[in-house]
Amino acid sequence: MTRKIDIFDTTLRDGEQSPGASMNTEEKLIVAQQLLRMHVDVIEAGFPISSPGDFRSVQEIGRLAGDDAVVVGLTRAVDKDIDRAAEALSCAKRPRIHTGLGVSPQHLADKLRISEDECVERAIRCVRYAKRYVEDVQFYAEDAGRADQGFLERVIQAVIEAGATVVNIPDTTGYQMPAAFGARIKGLCDNVRGIENVTIAVHTHNDLGMATALALAGVENGATQIECTINGLGERAGNTALEEVVMALRMHGDELDGHTDVVTQELTRASRLVSRITGMQVQANKAIVGANAFAHSSGIHQDGVLKSRGTYEIIDPADVGAAGSEIILSARSGHAALRHRLSELGYSFPESEFDDVYQRFLEIADQKKEVFDEDLESMVQERQRDVTAIYALESVQVVCGDAAIPTATVHITDEVGGEHVVACTGTGPVDAAYKAIDKVVSVHGDLQEFAVKAITRGIDAIGEVTVRIVAGDGRLYTGRGSDTDIVVSSAKAYVNAINRMIQTTRSKQGK
């Protein structure tokens, strides 16, 4: 069994420090509910002394979490900060005070203006002071990534002896290389007495784009808590992305000797929730949760994925709550991808015709970055409009109005010359016409989409109706019809879709 790696989420504290990403208490509670749904181990709910809003957030999230997660309030190594955090956490069942100070030469000389000895004294004092309120005290050695290793070990030794239960080793500026950061954690494990009895946490930033690699290097060398945020939100270039470390541990748990209890199927939902609340858009190519994370546009890749998802996807989209793989059609797409998408839209062509269809597709793709469904439908419209009519709509007559029950009478001929005249009522003239058509045809499709657009100008414009129906096997079939009368257009489109459905069924049966 691999080690349990605790996920410490700081979206509501460090993540909120992203410019423009601030959240009010109600929004923080919504995010906290999602974190609890994901089974995150620790939630850093805020910095209580910084504002009344942060104080209330820590208080409310402490109540909300119950026994399901540790709730953390951040402080400086200052008594009044710790007092305020303890007050905010008084309702939490599993409270933790997170206190500390800088330990790098830059922080000691330029920010704190204290000596190493004074730093050690403050570290001991803040831990002891926090222990008066709670048993669970986490100490952060800010900017540990640039600290002298010997001095860092001295500080960590001192706070463990003072009663710290968690020691947080941040690379606050994202400065370190992964191997060097891992060696730093290993040095602590080798040289600090009693460190095996506390939790070693890593808090890494993304200034050089290596936050996830740094965090995993820490885990490889003894850390058992990762501090991270949804979507990698945070100061400057952000923090370690929760979704990235969780999935890395899922994929490489044996190598890293670690696993998490996070419900990975909630990752995409969490990403979208935080993006919506903060207004911080997720880049399309963001690992795990980006819009393009499971999108394929290269023809070679598309062909491979269509044959077997595992050829180019190491993660099943369902495992992170994503809708599924997506084939992006462009000039780089091949025959397989085009045929697959056309099939999904309800279009099929024999081999003898498909090369012509593909060449027309390339002409369109050369003019556009991405070819959408509407482009494909327009592309095949001329060919498919002339589809052999199994049923032909001869006429439609409707009666409707404020005082009338909508009624449609359709006249349809079939492929063997039979004539059918049927009348039906409905909730409107189009519904009545569709019910009448259903009584005539031999198959039935459920209407999924109905769209109308004018394809010419003026009050006598021709209206084009596009419908999509779903057959019993789940396949989509598209139909189009145009006329100056929108009810006639609608009926034509429906019959067109029905004809396509029947043709495809017959083709499968070899008829």
Curated annotation (Swiss-Prot):
Catalytic activities: 3-methyl-2-oxobutanoate + acetyl-CoA + H2O = (2S)-2-isopropylmalate + CoA + H(+)
Biological processes annotated in GO: L-leucine biosynthetic process
Matching Pfam families: HCS_D2, HMGL-like, LeuA_dimer
Positions of region (Regulatory domain): 392-511
Record-listed E.C. numbers: 2.3.3.13
Obligatory cofactor(s): Mn(2+)
GO CC term (a single one): cytoplasm
Keywords assigned by UniProt, alphabetized: Amino-acid biosynthesis, Branched-chain amino acid biosynthesis, Cytoplasm, Leucine biosynthesis, Manganese, Metal-binding, Transferase
Primary role: Catalyzes the condensation of the acetyl group of acetyl-CoA with 3-methyl-2-oxobutanoate (2-ketoisovalerate) to form 3-carboxy-3-hydroxy-4-methylpentanoate (2-isopropylmalate).
Protein name listed in UniProt: 2-isopropylmalate synthase
Organism: Olsenella uli (strain ATCC 49627 / DSM 7084 / CCUG 31166 / CIP 109912 / JCM 12494 / LMG 11480 / NCIMB 702895 / VPI D76D-27C) (Lactobacillus uli)
Lineage, opening ranks: Bacteria, Bacillati, Actinomycetota, Coriobacteriia, Coriobacteriales
Gene name tied to this protein: leuA
